[in-house]
């Protein structure tokens, strides 16, 4: 009898841990799901220990017909720079925690240009090393669990994040592993509502933290999406803050 009871308790623990126990979602809270997400990513200590991250790989656009070399560097608490290179020309987007800028050579603009506050919104989100759920209270956001939703056949947990500026992120967590499999960002830019959908997968553990190595994003419900394939991740590399800042004008001769 004791052995049968032990087996039963073990099965209950297994199903609970895998997310298969209690499918009616009774009692599930946003705080519980956020805690599960943090644990799944590697834990608060590992997340805090990831101070910088350099990701390199390829950016596929136009349904994969164009391939650009991709390089992104992030630094806590909120700096990011992304370089995408094709045929010797490099597109740059960067945010230093206060202001953003870009270089757009494919549009005939080879000099750096500052971005408006609205144009910086996507960069600010991208700069978040661990996503919008970790440290959401400190960021002034609110998080609500809104139920389950199908994500390409997966009955995902859906969380709504309302940021301090009023923009909204929906975060979809895998029910078994509690990692993000999709995010939907709703932002107001230049008076227009922008909705971007991002799918995440192929997670690998880097310095104790699970990082997605496949990211596909674009306008929601649009077939035209870009895909990022990470080939190398370098944690806690030495990073010069100057790379995130708007370049100083070249000295005149």
Pin down the residues of each PLM region.
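Short, conserved active-site entrance elements at the starts or edges of catalytic domains
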Residues: 122-160, 179-182
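Gly/Pro-enriched, hydrophobic low-complexity segments
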Residues: 22, 89, 152-248
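Cleaved targeting-peptide boundary
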Residues: 23-30
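N-terminal mature ectodomain segment of secretory-pathway/periplasmic proteins
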Residues: 31-108, 139-147
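Bacterial N-terminal signal peptides
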Residues: 8-18
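Acidic/charged, solvent-exposed loop-and-adjacent secondary-structure segments enriched in E/D, K/R, S/T
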Residues: 101-131
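N-terminal secretory signal peptides that target proteins for export/translocation
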Residues: 1-3
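Short, solvent-exposed mixed-charge patches
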Residues: 252-253
């Amino acid at each position: 009898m004791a052995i049968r009871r032990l087996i039963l308790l073990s099965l209950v623990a297994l199903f609970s841990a895998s997310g298969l126990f209690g499918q009616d979602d009774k009692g599930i809270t946003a705080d519980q799901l956020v805690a599960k997400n943090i644990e799944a990513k590697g834990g608060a200590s590992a997340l805090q220990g990831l101070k910088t991250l350099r990701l390199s790989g390829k950016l596929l656009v136009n349904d994969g017909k164009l391939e650009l070399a991709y390089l992104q560097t992030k630094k806590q608490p909120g700096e990011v720079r992304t370089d995408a290179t094709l045929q010797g020309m490099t597109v740059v987007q960067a945010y230093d925690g206060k202001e953003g800028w870009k270089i757009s050579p494919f549009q005939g603009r080879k000099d750096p240009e500052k971005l408006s506050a609205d144009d910086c919104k996507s960069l600010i989100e991208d700069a978040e090393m661990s996503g919008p759920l970790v440290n959401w209270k400190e960021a002034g956001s609110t998080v609500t669990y809104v139920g389950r939703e199908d994500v390409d056949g997966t009955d995902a947990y859906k969380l709504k994040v309302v940021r301090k500026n009023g923009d909204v992120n929906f975060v979809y967590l895998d029910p078994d592993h509690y990692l993000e499999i999709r995010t939907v960002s709703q932002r107001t830019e230049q008076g227009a509502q922008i909705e971007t959908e991002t799918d995440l997968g192929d997670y690998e553990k880097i310095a104790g933290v699970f990082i997605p190595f496949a990211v596909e994003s674009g306008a929601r419900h649009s077939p035209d999406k870009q895909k990022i394939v990470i080939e190398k991740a370098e944690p806690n590399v030495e990073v010069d803050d100057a790379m995130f800042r708007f370049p100083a004008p070249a000295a005149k001769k």
